[in-house]
Design a protein with these regions (language model features):
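Basic/aromatic-rich interaction segments and small domains that mediate binding to polyanionic partners
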Residues: 1-27, 31-111
Length: 112
């Protein structure tokens, strides 16, 4: 369990401490690389959907993990290396990594 919960515990709020706990869990359990999609900013207001290969997570000493953006992933789109908020990518499939990303995104988007 990512946050040390049992099946009947309520989900805790998103805060710095819980984000670090979730980061440790994902670092130990995700299998990289995996495929995803994300919306890449282009200019001020435009975004385009791009395929993405997720290759890892930035360490807490490489970026700020906060309640606004959460855990930051790293990877490559067809054009360049990119860093992105992990909760903003879309994963498909039933692999354990895909389920972990969807669970994290659900918690991050609904408990902050």
């Amino acid at each position: 369990m990512a946050l040390g919960l049992t099946h009947d515990d309520p989900l805790p709020e998103v805060n710095h401490k819980n984000l670090l706990t979730y980061h440790r869990y994902l670092t130990r359990n995700l299998v990289f690389p995996f495929k995803a999609r994300y919306e890449k900013p282009v200019g001020w207001a435009k975004r385009i959907e791009m395929p993405l290969t997720v290759t890892g997570l930035l360490r807490p000493d490489e970026c700020e993990i906060d309640e606004q953006y959460g855990i930051i992933g790293s990877g490559r789109d067809p054009e360049e290396r990119v860093d992105f908020p992990l909760a903003e990518i879309e994963v498909k499939g039933s692999s354990p990594s895909c389920r972990m990303i969807r669970d994290y995104a659900y918690w991050f988007q609904n408990w902050r």
